[in-house]
Regions:
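Amphipathic, Lys/Arg-enriched alpha-helical "gate/interface" segment within cytosolic domains
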Residues: 1-128
Length: 128
């Protein structure tokens, strides 16, 4: 399954993990809300594991960060997340999101393979 808009691409892996690629350079609150709404629509509002490539993102506003880190906002229905950032600016942004609530498991990776390996292992163990 695959869905796409010009700025965000969602696909489901063979292992049932959602892979998202963000093509926005700047993420403000409205864009963050749209990304989350698109993700929830893609997953039919079911709980899921997520690998999110934010390598192209260069800026996230404070309001967007707060929304994306909130359990009823950006974290809604995510059981665990692996963030991919392949450049220094995106890596700084990814590290902000890794510092989410303690009961939410998230990690930062510099490549897709490591991110998928980690999230698939968590899913197979039933860990969030």
């Amino acid at each position: 399954m695959k869905t796409e808009n010009p700025a965000t691409l969602f696909t489901a892996t063979m292992e049932g993990v959602v892979f998202a690629e963000c093509n926005y350079l700047k993420v403000d609150l409205l864009i963050a809300m749209q990304i989350v709404a698109d993700r929830l629509d893609f997953t039919n509002h079911k709980k899921h594991y997520l690998v999110f490539d934010i390598s192209r993102v260069q800026n996230v506003t404070t309001d967007a960060k707060k929304f994306l880190q909130h359990p009823d906002g950006g974290l809604k229905n995510i059981l665990g997340a692996a963030l991919i950032a392949s450049n220094p600016v995106a890596a700084l942004i990814a590290n902000v999101f890794v510092k989410t609530p303690k009961d939410f498991q998230a990690r930062f990776f510099s490549n897709k393979k490591d991110a998928l390996d980690w999230i698939i292992a968590r899913k197979q163990k039933g860990l969030a």
